[in-house]
């Protein structure tokens, strides 16, 4: 498998995920098994739901391969610090600290950050990196990518693909 940052043929997708179309469709059909370990944790205003993915499922390997051979090769903004190797929590503050000359900052947290990344938004982003001239084939690749990445139209925290996708 080779590292790519743009998909130009349907075969590029299958090369980077390490399986054929039939195996991919079977893995997608078994999504409920992959995401089957849902844990509900009580919090102040309800529950926080976390999925414990089944690493024995084929979809786990497909997501890891997609990250390694495709999504992880896409250049991300210099302003994206989340989940980057060799970056810690305070790295994103450094340029603000140096520019403004003080160490005061406001920390905000996005409620359900991964779940807030919509299927429509992700589809638009992926469309940019799928460079196939024939509309039907391009749509098929983007649909497969969304099927690999999302569960119930949401990006799920705890999957090997969520951190990489959230920085796109």
Residue spans of the language-model regions?
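Non-catalytic, polymerase-adjacent accessory regions of viral genome-replication enzymes
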Residues: 1-45
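Non-catalytic, well-ordered alpha-helical scaffold segments
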Residues: 11, 60-64, 120, 143
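N-terminal low-complexity, intrinsically disordered segments
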Residues: 16, 20-21, 69-70, 74-77, ...
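Conserved polymerase palm-domain catalytic core
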Residues: 27, 98-168
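Active-site-proximal segment of RNA-dependent polymerases
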Residues: 58-107, 163-167
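Extracytoplasmic glycan-interaction modules
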Residues: 10-13, 47-51, 57-58, 133-137
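Short, conserved non-catalytic motifs in the polymerase core
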Residues: 39-63, 147-167
